[in-house]
Regions:
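Class I SAM-dependent methyltransferase Rossmann-like catalytic core
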Residues: 1-32
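Class I SAM-dependent methyltransferase SAM/SAH-binding core
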Residues: 36, 44-101
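Conserved glycine-rich SAM-binding loop
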Residues: 41
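A conserved beta-strand element that flanks and buttresses the S-adenosyl-L-methionine
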Residues: 118
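A short, conserved alpha-helix within the catalytic core of class I
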Residues: 125-138
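Conserved beta-strand signature within the Rossmann-like core of class I S-adenosyl-L-methionine
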Residues: 145-157
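Conserved Class I S-adenosyl-L-methionine
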Residues: 161-185
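Core SAM-dependent methyltransferase catalytic element
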Residues: 196-216
Length: 216
């Protein structure tokens, strides 16, 4: 990941995956309301998606202060009326900032209805507790019918879907023993505990998956 003097960080994978992800989001996201992006990272996805999803309000977030600075920097280069400043959200917290209406008022969001949560490439580069926190938060925040969208590599049936994913998993675990490619069935089981129904799994380029849940 490269960082330029203007604070914009760049993740090369975003340029490769943003269009395929957008095509899925255009189909599965609600047409109105706030879409909360968890672990927005550099902010490149947010600035690409928001102007192409004009019916919704895109709210990025990240627990890392440097990532939030990058998100704000990208927003200055590519402003959009429906793109809001990033919030500091750690999914492992028992209460997220979006559960406090005054926090949304501060950034000018008058409509406090979060109708979807998007999380791209997080749960394999975070402790398992982050996945647990994500599901718990989505279960608390989303209304009935609300959408949770995940993107990234997953194991299916306890097995890697490609040799490249197996090697990636090994490299992740060498970097941090708490990281790793997650088993999709384990993720969906946790989701069920928080009233999140697995709607569909969509194969994506480079052996990734889009996984869609609905609050019920």
């Amino acid at each position: 990941m490269n960082q330029s003097p203007d604070l914009r960080q760049h993740a090369p994978a975003t340029e490769r995956n943003r269009q395929p992800i957008l095509e899925v989001l255009q189909r599965v996201l609600p047409s109105r309301g706030i879409v909360l992006e968890i672990a927005s990272g550099t902010g490149e996805h947010a600035t690409f998606f928001a102007p192409r999803l004009q019916g919704i309000q895109w709210l990025p977030s990240d627990p890392d202060i440097n990532h939030r600075a990058s998100i704000e920097a990208w927003q200055r280069y590519f402003p959009s009326d429906n793109l809001y400043p990033p919030l500091a959200i750690d999914v492992r917290s028992s209460v997220w900032l979006v559960e406090q209406p005054d926090q949304l008022n501060e950034i000018g969001l008058k409509n406090h209805s979060i109708t979807a949560i998007v999380c791209i490439n997080m749960i394999h580069i975070a402790p398992w507790s982050a996945c647990l926190g994500l599901m718990a938060g989505a279960g608390r925040i989303l209304p009935n019918g609300g959408i949770l969208y995940l993107y990234g590599p997953f194991k299916q049936g306890g097995k890697h879907t490609a040799d490249s994913n197996k090697m990636f998993d090994e490299s992740l675990r060498l970097s941090n023993q708490e990281w790793g490619v997650r088993d999709l069935e384990e993720v969906t089981d946790i989701a069920k505990n928080h009233h999140l129904k697995h709607l569909e799994t969509i194969p994506m380029p480079a052996n990734n998956l889009s996984v869609v849940f609905q609050r019920c």
